[in-house]
């Protein structure tokens, strides 16, 4: 689906729905529910003006835009690729530290961060954990159980056995109608494996999630919006904050799309997600980099 062609999209699974809106998050809704902001694929350290001449400024602009939101979110989640790949362990840590310092500029101090393969695949997440902590974890917020999955630290694009056992144990604590939101970097389903847009053993994770009626997944990695349902499980990818990538399979190869001087920051942005807990619905609004 192309959300740019419609002001309103409703994706309905058997137990969850997502509305993609072009309206503001209301103060009335804020009193009843909650919302969070999702940033993704900031790639701090990337430096190629052909694809983004403002590579050191785009993340800062996004942080400023979030800080200008009239109603501040309950928390912010950053779904991976905080930094760009760097083979030098010392330089990699420098970039992780710089990115952390910029992220600390958010007014909202409850920030959930998870790795992307650019952050973690070269050393199984060791440097990442020095700066941001655990690569997978859970938390609860106002009636929603959030699960953060690490499908990037293993360089084979897989989820490890220990994490599967952990996931099974965590899900075993929940009722089948629990409100569950899952964050990860890669798509859990086979979006386009030829471009590494998948999780090699993602089907196993979905088999664990499938018995639960209300599951929604938010991820990054593909640098664009994509909305997909696996049965009743809805999957929603976020835009990048550094450069665009083509639609899945639209070009012979996965290549970065050049910066458009006539439309600076085109295709880049972040989103807010309003949780309507009783109905297990999530209202999404997309923001450009320059606006809050």
Name each model-derived stretch:
Residues 42-45, 82-85, 117-121, 152-155, ...:
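Solvent-exposed loop/turn segments at secondary-structure junctions
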Residues 18, 22, 57-60, 197-212:
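Short, motif-level signal for alpha-helix interfacial/capping segments enriched in acidic residues
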Residues 11, 24-93, 191:
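N-terminal active-site segment of His-dependent metallophosphoesterases
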Residues 284-292:
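C-terminal/domain-terminus segments
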Residues 39-40, 76-80, 111-117, 182-184, ...:
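Active-site neighborhood of phospho(di)ester-bond hydrolases with catalytic His/Asp-centered motifs
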Residues 175-191:
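Short acidic, glycine-rich surface-loop motifs adjacent to enzyme active sites
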Residues 1, 7-27:
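N-terminal export signals
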Residues 88-179, 199-216, 228-239, 243-283:
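Extended active-site neighborhood of metal-dependent phosphoesterases/phosphodiesterases
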């Amino acid at each position: 689906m192309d959300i740019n062609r419609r002001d309103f999209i409703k994706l309905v699974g058997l137990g969850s729905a997502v509305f993609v809106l072009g309206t503001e998050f209301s103060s009335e809704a804020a009193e009843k529910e909650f919302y969070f902001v999702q940033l993704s694929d900031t790639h701090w350290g990337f430096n190629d003006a052909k694809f983004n001449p403002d590579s050191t400024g785009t993340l800062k602009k996004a942080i400023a835009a979030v800080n200008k939101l009239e109603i501040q979110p309950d928390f912010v989640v950053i779904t991976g690729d905080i930094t760009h790949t760097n083979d030098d362990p010392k330089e990699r840590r420098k970039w992780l530290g710089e990115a952390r310092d910029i992220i600390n500029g958010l007014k909202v101090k409850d920030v959930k961060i998870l790795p992307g393969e650019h952050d973690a695949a070269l050393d199984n997440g060791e440097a990442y954990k020095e700066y941001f902590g655990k690569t997978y974890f859970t938390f609860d917020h106002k009636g929603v159980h959030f699960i953060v999955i690490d499908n990037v630290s293993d360089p084979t694009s897989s989820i490890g056995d220990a994490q599967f056992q952990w996931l099974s144990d965590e899900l075993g604590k929940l009722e089948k109608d629990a409100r569950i939101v899952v964050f990860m970097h890669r798509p859990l389903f086979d979006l386009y494996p030829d471009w590494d847009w998948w999780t090699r053993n993602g089907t196993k994770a979905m088999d664990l999630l499938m018995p639960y009626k209300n599951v929604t997944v938010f991820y990054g990695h593909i640098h664009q919006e994509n909305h997909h349902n696996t049965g009743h499980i809805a999957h929603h990818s976020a835009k990048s904050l550094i450069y665009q990538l083509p639609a899945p399979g639209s070009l012979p190869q996965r290549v970065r799309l050049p910066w458009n001087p006539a439309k600076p920051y085109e295709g880049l942005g972040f989103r807010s997600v309003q949780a309507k807990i009783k109905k297990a619905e999530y209202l999404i609004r997309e923001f450009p980099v320059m606006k809050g």
